[in-house]
């Protein structure tokens, strides 16, 4: 498999998981409106249970579809679902960590945090999936370079679709 294609194919569940809460989110905030000891919200209204579990579900379904399209990539449905679930969970945990850090830095909801927004979910996803499946270092480096561009393009698209209030 072409290394560039493989890098994208591998990380696709995380990309979908990270972007799905924009459409699927809403409802009860993960932090239930509670504040941290600094008096600021833990995560904020933008991180909801519906978005979190919706994102994990979408990412896991994407991985399942990938297996059905190319069964040889993972070798088994069990491994495909496991990797997709861990990539998705990792992406959303990384996004939550980013929100936590942004609240501690007193950054308002939706405010862009260059690097944190683009690499936090990616690095966390890769770490979570590491026990089941990895990709070569060169592919990881490629993803570190292209993910900020893809993230920006996805945000502009979501803004134009009126799914987001700001294009970042």
Curated annotation (Swiss-Prot):
Translocase as UniProt keyword: no
Membrane topology: Multi-pass membrane protein
GO MF annotation, one: CDP-2,3-bis-(O-geranylgeranyl)-sn-glycerol synthase activity
Subcellular location: Cell membrane
Domain of life: Archaea
Membrane-crossing segments per the record: 4-24, 51-71, 81-101, 112-132, 138-158
UniProt catalytic activity: 2,3-bis-O-(geranylgeranyl)-sn-glycerol 1-phosphate + CTP + H(+) = CDP-2,3-bis-O-(geranylgeranyl)-sn-glycerol + diphosphate
GO BP annotations listed: glycerophospholipid biosynthetic process
Sorted UniProt keywords: Cell membrane, Lipid biosynthesis, Lipid metabolism, Magnesium, Membrane, Phospholipid biosynthesis, Phospholipid metabolism, Transferase, Transmembrane, Transmembrane helix
Entry-linked InterPro entries: CarS, CarS_archaea
Entry GO terms, CC: plasma membrane
Cofactors that this protein relies on: Mg(2+)
Pathway: Membrane lipid metabolism; glycerophospholipid metabolism
One protein family per Pfam: CarS-like
EC number assigned by the record: 2.7.7.67
Role description: Catalyzes the formation of CDP-2,3-bis-(O-geranylgeranyl)-sn-glycerol (CDP-archaeol) from 2,3-bis-(O-geranylgeranyl)-sn-glycerol 1-phosphate (DGGGP) and CTP. This reaction is the third ether-bond-formation step in the biosynthesis of archaeal membrane lipids.
NCBIfam families named among the record's database cross-references: PRK04032.1 (NF003114)
HAMAP family for this protein: CDP_archaeol_synth
PANTHER family hit by this protein: CDP-ARCHAEOL SYNTHASE
Name of the protein this chain belongs to: CDP-archaeol synthase
Organism for this UniProt entry: Pyrococcus abyssi (strain GE5 / Orsay)
């Amino acid at each position: 498999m072409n290394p560039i294609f493989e890098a994208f194919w591998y990380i696709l569940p995380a990309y979908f998981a990270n972007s799905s809460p924009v459409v699927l989110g809403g409802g009860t905030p993960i932090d239930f409106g509670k504040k941290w000891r600094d008096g600021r919200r833990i995560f904020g209204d933008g991180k909801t249970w519906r978005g979190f579990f919706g994102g994990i579900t979408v990412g896991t379904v994407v991985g399942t579809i990938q297996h059905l399209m190319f069964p040889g990539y993972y070798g088994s449905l069990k491994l495909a679902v496991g990797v997709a679930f861990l990539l998705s969970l990792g992406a959303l945990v990384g996004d939550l960590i980013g929100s936590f850090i942004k609240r501690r830095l007193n950054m308002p909801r939706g405010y862009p945090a260059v690097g944190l927004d683009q690499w936090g979910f990616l690095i966390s996803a890769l770490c979570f999936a590491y026990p089941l499946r990895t990709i070569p270092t060169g592919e990881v480096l490629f993803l570190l370079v292209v993910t900020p561009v893809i993230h920006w393009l996805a945000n502009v698209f979501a803004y134009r679709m009126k799914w987001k209030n700001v294009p970042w």
